[in-house]
Curated annotation (Swiss-Prot):
This is Small ribosomal subunit protein uS8. Part of the 30S ribosomal subunit. Contacts proteins S5 and S12. One of its GO terms (molecular function) is rRNA binding. HAMAP family: Ribosomal_uS8_B. The gene is rpsH. Signal peptide: none annotated. Keywords: Ribonucleoprotein, Ribosomal protein, RNA-binding, rRNA-binding. GO terms for biological process: translation. It comes from the Bacteria. Pfam families: Ribosomal_S8 (PF00410). PROSITE patterns: RIBOSOMAL_S8. Belongs to the universal ribosomal protein uS8 family. One of the primary rRNA binding proteins, it binds directly to 16S rRNA central domain where it helps coordinate assembly of the platform of the 30S subunit.
Length: 132
């Protein structure tokens, strides 16, 4: 069975592993998932990620990040633009997550960017997800 929304699957696996206090989560690899993981790492939501060769295809291993007393660094993840309802934003109307405390992941012509990077670059695009 083919997966209709691999980004939603990626976010759901992260959300479930985070709520179960797992140290890492393994999922099927794709370039867009690796780019999202890179954004999450640069924003401090995950500690690291790596690509491994599996028996069939590649897999992406994401190491989750917790505080000193095991408090979660990811409070929430939400998929915004879905295959059935695409959501786009202009550079002048980019969303702010929790008043700037969270991050919106935007797919632009310059690649995947955060809402702050897209505003600085003056580009808009498809709003993929919110992370806070």
């Amino acid at each position: 069975m083919t997966m209709t929304d691999p980004i939603a699957d990626f976010l759901t696996r992260l959300r479930n592993a985070n709520s179960a206090y797992h140290d890492e989560v393994t999922l099927p690899h794709s370039k867009i998932k690796a780019n999202i993981a890179e954004i999450l790492k640069s924003e401090g939501y995950i500690s690291d990620y790596r690509t491994e060769d599996a028996r069939v295809g590649k897999s992406l291993v994401v190491q989750l990040k917790y505080g000193p007393s095991r408090e979660r660094s990811i409070a929430g993840l939400r998929r915004v633009s879905k295959p059935g309802l695409r959501v786009y934003a202009k550079s002048t109307n980019l969303p702010r997550v929790l008043g700037g405390l969270g991050v919106a992941i935007i797919s632009t012509s310059s690649g995947l960017l955060t809402d702050r990077q897209a505003a600085r670059s003056g580009v808009g695009g498809e709003v993929l997800a919110y992370v806070w």
